[in-house]
Amino acid sequence: MALIEPTAINNKKVIVGMSGGVDSSVSAYLLLKQGYQVEGLFMKNWEEDDTDEYCAAADDLKDAQAVCDKLGIKLHTVNFASEYWDNVFEYFLAEYKAGRTPNPDIICNKEIKFKAFLEFADDILDADYIAMGHYVRRSDESGQSQMLRGRDGNKDQSYFLYTLSHEQISRSLFPVGELEKSEVREIAKEMGLVTHDKKDSTGICFIGERKFTDFLSTFLPAQPGNIETAEGEIIGKHQGLMYHTLGQRKGLGIGGMKNSNDDPWYVVDKEMDRNVLVVGQGGHHPRLMSVGFYADQLHWVDRKGPIDGAQITVKTRYRQRDVACTLTYEGDDRIKVIFDEPVAAVTPGQSAVFYDAELCLGGGIIDSLIRE
């Protein structure tokens, strides 16, 4: 098993974001093993209003405390619920209201885990570094800190961290980024950590196990409308465009239809002005494909960004394979990206993250699509 070798670290204090999961648990252990002075910090980012979510958060805190007790380190707690509401949740609602599909985890990393958390660790806990259980790697070879993909290609989380600056990366450690997930679980089991077989968390943290539609409808009024084929035929009703995203296949409520084949139906467009959900058959329907996109709200890790006309690769959603592309600037905060080959289900509101081989360059928010 490829453990990270201990290094000579004297009196450097690291505050580890302890979530109650296996990745942060092993991160704390590895940093102790390397000789750091380690303390944990458990963040409460959401005020739970029902029993299941409250219990889940309480269980996470209990697991985080058990791991810290086992490792012999302090666990601090902090409540960032108001910061989360103002900076993450309100953005999430505004994007859905505008018909886009945001990624709140990316905003949470930007505003909470690597901003509010870092400030608290600095001001209150006198930290030299913070550490998280993310599957990314840090490189300092160029003279400034840069972010590389995690060693485990299936778990690489650089897509979610592209908004970090090289200054933030220089203050952050990512101990599990050099490991495979299976190795992380093996270490946790060997060390007798209660989190060794705990399921990975999935979905949006403030929704938890609740139905997404039920949750969203408590904050945004639904506006039902027609479902139409790309040819304009009305074939059903939707309960609100905000409940649907491009490329979606499940939950459309479209049964078998006369004169149509057996190919599954996909959301291929959302026409906000008419409140119409447009669907087509097949995952490569022409309305679902794009040859490129425009993006804004740019963030480059090194502050400069790639050169105009750079030929690099891009991910337009997590776990998507990299797609080769050419990037050109349309102004200080807008880019045009053309794929080498058409891509399905590129979605406004989602993040486009750019890479040069293993190096994460940064990215932006997809604003509009280029169909041809």
Swiss-Prot record:
- Annotated disulfide bonds: C108-C205
What are the alphabetically sorted keywords of the record?
ATP-binding, Cytoplasm, Disulfide bond, Nucleotide-binding, RNA-binding, Transferase, tRNA processing, tRNA-binding
- A GO term for molecular function: tRNA-uridine 2-sulfurtransferase activity
Q: Which reaction does it catalyse?
A: S-sulfanyl-L-cysteinyl-[protein] + uridine(34) in tRNA + AH2 + ATP = 2-thiouridine(34) in tRNA + L-cysteinyl-[protein] + A + AMP + diphosphate + H(+)
Q: Name one GO biological process term.
A: tRNA wobble position uridine thiolation
Extract the Pfam families matched here. Answer: tRNA_Me_trans (PF03054), tRNA_Me_trans_C (PF20258), tRNA_Me_trans_M (PF20259)
Which leading EC class covers this enzyme? transferase
- Provide the Gene Ontology terms for cellular component: cytoplasm
Q: Where in the cell is it found?
A: Cytoplasm
Q: Where does ATP bind?
A: G17, M18, S19, G20, G21, V22, D23, S24, M43, G133
Designated name of the protein: tRNA-specific 2-thiouridylase MnmA
Gene for this chain: mnmA
